[in-house]
A protein has these predicted regions:
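Metabolite-binding pocket within alpha/beta catalytic cores that recognizes anionic/polar moieties
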Residues: 1-139
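Flexible, glycine/charged-enriched surface loops at secondary-structure junctions
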Residues: 41-47, 150-155, 241
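Short acidic/polar active-site loop segments enriched in Thr and Asp
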Residues: 89-90, 180, 199
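Active-site rim beta-loop-alpha module in soluble metabolic enzymes
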Residues: 128-177
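Generic non-transmembrane alpha-helical segments
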Residues: 140-148, 192, 234-241
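Zn-dependent metallopeptidase/amidohydrolase metal-coordination segment
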Residues: 187-223
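His/Asp/Glu-rich mid-to-C-terminal helical/loop segments that flank catalytic regions of hydrolases
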Residues: 212-241
Length: 241
């Protein structure tokens, strides 16, 4: 490990987090997470320009944390680093992705394994092996989501810093290689988590389709928003289980 100038740490007065928690990438989901955390008597803490709530144990439920938003690889990893420094060890990331494959449709869920990284953050977390999401948690989440009536795909994704620069050739190439979706954060998050030796799993709701060469957005519909909220509640309950 290189001799870096700044290491993440817990400052005076900052909380000791439970080991399990949920990081919501998107602002809309993070806003719903704030409301849910308040309903569950969550204690709010400072976290950059994001939110952080510590949810206490209740009845048979374990304590956990909820954080977000954290859009883009640099902010997502900055947030992850702080969560790990505060005690997070088993982190579920909830976000959205675009579909690169004709079998993956709006409203489906992708559970990413590894990533093709075009973002600039993951390279700062060098590893000897390709990082992947935590397999046991990924399988448990797959079972949970399927039981909830969702269509689930497990496989690699492409992470990019520039969604407005995704070319048709790239979409076609990655789709042909079996890359299911494209997002902005996962490749960096899974690399940083492996570097810090913590467990990370991601759940990506398909918000739009790119595979045809014509962009098809789906995130504006009420049905999509309702499904996104439902998944958020499922994941919060999973963290408490």
């Amino acid at each position: 490990m290189s001799d870096v100038v700044i290491n993440p740490g817990r400052e005076k007065g900052e909380p000791h987090l439970p080991d399990a928690g949920l990081l919501c990438v998107n602002p809309g989901d993070a806003a719903q997470a704030v409301s849910l955390a308040k309903e569950r008597q969550g204690l709010r803490h400072f976290l950059f320009n994001s939110n952080l709530f510590q949810i206490p144990a209740a009845d048979q439920e374990k304590p956990y944390f909820m954080a977000g938003p954290a859009v883009g690889a640099p902010m997502a990893v900055l947030t992850l680093e702080k969560l790990v420094a505060l005690g997070g060890r088993r982190i579920i990331v909830y976000g959205w992705c675009g579909s690169l494959h004709d079998t993956v449709r709006i409203g489906d869920v992708v559970l990413p394994t590894w990533a093709v990284s075009s973002e600039g953050t993951s390279a700062h977390y060098p590893l000897n092996v390709r990082p992947e999401s935590h397999s046991d948690t990924r399988q448990a989440l797959k079972d949970l989501l399927i039981d909830g009536g969702l269509t689930v795909h497990t496989g690699p994704v492409w992470s990019t810093d520039a969604p407005y620069r995704e070319s048709r050739d790239q979409v076609k190439q990655f789709g042909a290689q079996g890359i299911f979706g494209v997002d902005m954060e996962y490749g960096a998050l899974v690399a940083a988590a492996a570097f810090r030796k913590v467990e990370l799993t991601a759940v990506l709701l398909v918000s739009d389709e790119l595979w045809s060469g014509t962009w098809k957005p789906g995130f504006r519909s009420k049905l999509f928003r309702k499904k996104s909220s439902s998944i958020l509640h499922l994941l919060a309950d999973f963290c408490a289980g």
